[in-house]
Amino acid sequence: MKKKYIMGNWKMNMLPDEAAKYMEGINRLTTMLKGKEDVRKIVLFVPSVDYYIANLMKEEQIYVGLQNMYFKEKGAYTGEISYEMVKALNAEHVLVGHSERREIFKEDDSIINEKVKAGLNNGIKVVLCVGESEKTYNEGKTKEFVENQIVKALEGVSKENISNEEDLIIAYEPIWAIGTGKVCSSDDADNMCKVIRDKVKEILDIDVPVLYGGSVNEQNSNEILLKENIDGVLVGGASLDPEKFAKIIYSGHKLGE
């Protein structure tokens, strides 16, 4: 059975006491996955203020990552979290390039590229988010746009900095499908995940896991996860409810198949 990556992004949600209650629930609901990381890997990207309690309470079948990281070691960068701080917390995974970081906080391709390199050069597993706007999608330019995002994000990256397939994961999240209730068709998502995998292979000569994100929920996750070229999902709103998130975790091929 092919391994699936189930990742949740809490965004700016959950106070520490809420995070603690959540972790109790998700631990209980995923107990049967202990020792089964070869078929399901669960990662929760939490706000930095929740990291301590979430990481303290998590059981072995769950990983906790951070939603952002700056590419400088230290300095006068008010409000930022350096890659050294991420390492000091033993946070193995970090999100880079999410559309909300690109759009709201004006992170351009050069900043995304620096973050990718900082992560990979310092032993942090990078989940790189890419995806097109609704305008780009309607103009039929999705493939060209996303391939260009990947080229720019991976400029100067060497496969020597990638020791295993989990060091670099790409999440395809069409912007028009994030938090809107609109869902990219599973066939289109499958095709784009193949496009992305092929582009990374062309650039780095390695195969990387490619996930889909964008209004993923417990109703559509099964269809998405059964697609050949989709290695997992990056879940937003539905990851805030441990019951719903657990249903997504168990979607797709049943364990043992």
Kindly label every feature range from the protein language model.
Residues 1-257:
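Active-site loop-to-helix "anion-binding N-cap" substructures in soluble metabolic enzymes
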